[in-house]
C-alpha cells in the first residue's frame, strides 16, 4: 500500500462529517483489502500517529477543547489524520494552521475534533478474519516530541494566535 492509497482511505468527505459515518465508511473500505494490505495500512496509520505525537499538536488540541488526556489526544490525532494528508502535514509542521479550518465536526454545538478508535478499525477487521492480532508495532517515544506547551493563557495566545482567535478562552 502506498501513502497515497492510505490517505485516500482515511480522508473524510468533509471536515464536519459525522464521526460514526466516518468510521463506518473506513470500515467498509478496509473490508475490501487483503490481509497484507490491512497490515500495511495499520503500519502507516501507526507511523502517522507517532509523527503527530508532539507537544505542539497537543497544545492545539488543548486550545480547541481543553484536551488533557493521552486517550483524548490519540482521538484528536485520529481526527487530524481523517482531515487528509494536506491538512495533516500542515498541522504537524505548524499546529496553529488548524485555526484556518473553517468547518468542524460538532457535538452539542461545540467543535468536536475527535475520532474514537479510528486507529483500531484495521486491527479489528484483521482479528475478525484471522482469529489473530495484527503484528505489534512499537508506538515510539514515551512522551510527546518537543517542548511541553504552557497552560498560561498569554503564552497559548502567543503560540497559537489563529486557534486562540477561533476558539477564545
Positions of the model-derived regions?
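Phenylalanine-focused residue identity feature
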Residues: 6, 41, 45, 73, ...
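N-terminal domain-start signal
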Residues: 1-56, 154-168
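An amphipathic alpha-helical core segment
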Residues: 101-149
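Secondary-structure junction/capping motif
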Residues: 18, 69, 112-116
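Core of folded catalytic or high-affinity ligand/protein-binding domains
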Residues: 28-106
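Long, solvent-exposed, polar/charged low-complexity segments
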Residues: 7, 130-169
Amino acid at each position: 500500500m502506498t501513502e497515497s492509497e492510505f490517505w485516500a482511505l482515511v480522508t473524510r468527505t468533509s471536515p464536519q462529517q459525522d464521526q460514526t459515518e466516518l468510521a463506518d465508511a473506513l470500515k467498509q473500505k478496509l473490508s475490501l483489502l487483503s490481509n497484507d494490505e490491512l497490515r500495511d495500512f495499520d503500519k502507516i496509520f501507526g507511523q502517522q500517529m507517532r509523527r503527530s505525537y508532539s507537544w505542539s499538536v497537543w497544545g492545539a488540541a488543548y486550545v480547541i477543547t481543553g484536551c488533557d488526556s493521552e486517550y483524548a489526544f490519540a482521538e484528536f490525532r485520529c481526527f487530524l489524520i481523517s482531515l487528509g494528508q494536506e491538512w495533516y502535514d500542515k498541522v504537524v509542521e505548524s499546529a496553529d494552521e488548524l485555526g484556518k479550518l473553517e468547518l468542524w465536526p460538532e457535538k452539542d454545538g461545540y467543535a468536536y475534533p475527535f475520532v474514537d478508535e479510528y486507529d483500531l478499525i484495521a486491527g479489528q477487521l484483521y482479528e475478525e478474519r484471522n482469529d489473530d492480532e495484527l503484528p505489534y508495532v512499537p508506538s515510539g517515544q514515551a512522551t510527546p516530541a518537543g517542548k511541553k506547551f504552557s497552560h498560561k493563557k498569554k503564552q497559548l495566545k502567543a503560540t497559537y494566535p489563529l486557534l486562540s482567535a477561533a476558539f477564545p478562552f
